[in-house]
Amino acid sequence: EGQQRDEIITTIFSHPSDAAAAAVKGYKIITLYPDEYGLPDPEALKKAVSEKTAGLLITNPEDTGIFNSKIREFTKIVHDAGALCGYDQANANGLLGITRAKEADFDMCFFNLHKSFSSPHGCGGPATGALGVRESLIDYMPIPLVEFDGGQYRFRYDLPQTIGKVRGFYGVFPAVLRAYTWIMSMGAEGLKEVAEVAVLNNNYVMKKIQKLRGAEISYPKTPGRIEQVRYTWEKLTEETGVTTEDVTNRMVDFGFHLWSSHHPWVVPQPFTIEPTESYSKAELDEYLAGMEKTVKEAYEDPDKVKNAPYQSVSHKIDHHPLDDPEKWAITWRAYLKKQKKRK
């Protein structure tokens, strides 16, 4: 049956790593797209599942910031097909202390310790995650597991169905340590407050951005958002010729980073803001002021925005090599390997 079940279902607004990790292991990927409300239709999931379905890997809320309130219906559909459900909780920043993966009937979940639990992204890292599974799946976990017998901690290696060791099984230790101390210092009530403030900050920013000329939220038929929002500059681009890349470059001059979106760009001219709980109202207002100035310039002097940034050591960065597997290399060893291959 394991060989027969060779398909993983995900959604286009789930984190791309959900599809990528499964694809690396040889699974065929089925991707569900959103309806007019920004969410995949349960009927589409019913059509996608079959005797070939191994599992569902989904992020909720998705990267639009929209929470799928029908998530238990999704897990039931997949379970009824004999498959498993994995919950990518990369966007848990707005859910801590409010809802859990188990309550949505997931079999597995994983958290980004480098994002939701105090460690900064740090230019794409240092990434590390915590994986949790139902009791029935423990025997399949990588080894070693750390267990506490009531008196001392110990490594456990005797898992009958284990996949064995994985590279870097300790994770990025500083990120793990920071996450542990942060969780213990915050406590249950503190973690819930983190989520509440993250949602509050995000919705404050959203209301302000919706007043900006040329900016809109994606999927406006669903007005509510959790901890982030996927916006669109489509109207701004149509009216001024200024693109989301141009706005991003201009924000650099004010000392701010503005992120667009994962690829492919389902939302046209996208930009995504996830304020988290860390920033004060004054800091958010400063960020919004930079964005407001950029929009004003776009309508009054679009070339000024298009030629930005002006206060950066790198005037323009060519991002195209990052989309070409033959050119990019994330380690020195990978770089040397590709150089040798070219020769």
Range-by-range predicted roles:
Residues 99, 149-166, 176, 183-343:
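Non-catalytic terminal extensions of PLP-dependent enzymes
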Residues 13-15, 172, 264:
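Short glycine-enriched loops at secondary-structure junctions
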Residues 7-9, 19, 46, 62, ...:
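Generic hydrophobic alpha-helical scaffold/packing signal
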Residues 1-154, 161, 241-242, 268-269:
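Conserved PLP-enzyme active-site core in the AAT-like
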Residues 125, 171-178, 225:
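Catalytic-loop motifs flanking and including active-site residues across diverse enzymes
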Residues 62, 167-170:
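Acidic/His-rich catalytic or pseudo-catalytic neighborhoods
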Residues 24, 51, 80, 103-107, ...:
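Short, well-ordered loop/turn and helix-capping segments at boundaries between secondary-structure elements
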